[in-house]
Amino acid sequence: MSKPLPLVTRQGDRIAIVSGLRTPFAKQATAYHGVPAVDLGKIVVSELLARSGVAPELIDQLVFGQVVQMPEAPNIAREIVLGTGMSVHTDAYSVSRACATSFQAVANVAESIIAGSVTVAIAGGADSSSVLPIGVSKALARTLVDVNKARTLSQRLKLFSRLKLRDLLPVAPAVAEYSTGLRMGDTAEQMAKTYGISRQDQDALALRSHQMAAQAWQQGLLHDEVMTAYIPPFSDAITEDNNIRKDSTMEQYAKLRPAFDRKHGSVTAANSTPLTDGAAAVMMMSESKAKELGLQPLGYLRSFAFSAIDVWQDMLLGPSYATPLALDRAGITLADLTLIDMHEAFAAQTLANLKMFASDSFAREKLGRSQAIGEVDMSKFNVLGGSIAYGHPFAATGARMITQTLNELRRRGGGLGLTTACAAGGLGAAMIVEVE
């Protein structure tokens, strides 16, 4: 076990998260069709600033992420600063840790506050699966470079004449791991088979996610943390997530065919998170700065941890590796948690991680620990639903989970919450948040 690692400044200040906000999340090619991630980021940060009452010139830094990169805006963070009326002197840089990107943004801001180089900052992420960087073939790309260096028209025409018709076809972004060629769904299928996770259990978790998310919206629990987003030319607005199935049944889920292993698989579109557009952000500062500004923090960041594992087998087990570290650094156990929010990339991945949390053999063989961190009390788990229901704009999910968990802890009178996620490349993230 690791020793506790308090997240405090030299003056003993804790890291306060004073506010959090997100856009409604929308399925690919629906409400945000044609709206790039950078615009979604501007929308949410502008509204976060307006609601916070914090003067824009007080923001020292903005750390933001985007997984599906757009060549025309490689530093999304700086574009958001320049497009939201913030001071041009506000520092800004972008990060990417796949599905854990906004976890990384929050961690970076926390470390800067601890170091004393930043007092007030914004962290978050945005992604669009509707506005994609459609590329060209390698042959055409190479030819275009050569054409740019050619001196005469005849040289240019000769270069183009070597191309074949297929070289002119557009190339969609890759959906597989660069290093292995495996899709996320392939790994989810492998984990379902390895750990004996049935199709019925996957469908049941997906149904639970949608039911709880629908209930959260019906009870008005999300209204304060989800803004109304107006879509250019601003005649239309989206007020709620549009992926949530409010009246689905197990019978409907059972009718769907497997999406990856067509013959023997159990992972379907219904028990997986969909491609999604959206943005989310949190405002962070030192505890003393929050007091100085008269702000009541949503809560505090108690600890965080990241992990990296093999990409060929069990690539989505990141939460099972990162969570024990985050618990140790916070000086607590799984039983001390009031809430647990785990990113549901796939129902199979989620259920596999829950099994590993409770597995003594996994703890001994993979983590070098004497025993498992424990079995998860499902009454604490994803109590407002998860990513299968809300959707998953890759870089925004972490900020959504943190904000959602803090608000729910406040409704329950305080406590400790775990937010954790798997990520492409065998990465994992876990954060412990606290509300008094």
From Swiss-Prot:
Biological or metabolic pathway of the protein: Lipid metabolism; fatty acid beta-oxidation
Active site per UniProt: 99, 392, 422
GO cellular component, one term: cytosol
SUPFAM superfamilies: Thiolase-like
Record's catalysed reaction(s): an acyl-CoA + acetyl-CoA = a 3-oxoacyl-CoA + CoA
GO molecular function: acetyl-CoA C-acyltransferase activity
Top-rank taxon: Bacteria
EC number: 2.3.1.16
Keywords on record: Acyltransferase, Cytoplasm, Fatty acid metabolism, Lipid degradation, Lipid metabolism, Transferase
GO biological process, one term: fatty acid beta-oxidation
Localisation per UniProt entry: Cytoplasm
Disulfide bonds: none
PANTHER family registered for this protein in UniProt: ACETYL-COA ACETYLTRANSFERASE, CYTOSOLIC, ACETYL-COA C-ACYLTRANSFERASE
Homology family: Belongs to the thiolase-like superfamily. Thiolase family.
Function: Catalyzes the final step of fatty acid oxidation in which acetyl-CoA is released and the CoA ester of a fatty acid two carbons shorter is formed.
This protein's name: 3-ketoacyl-CoA thiolase
Naturally occurring in which organism (per UniProt): Yersinia enterocolitica serotype O:8 / biotype 1B (strain NCTC 13174 / 8081)
Gene that encodes the chain: fadI
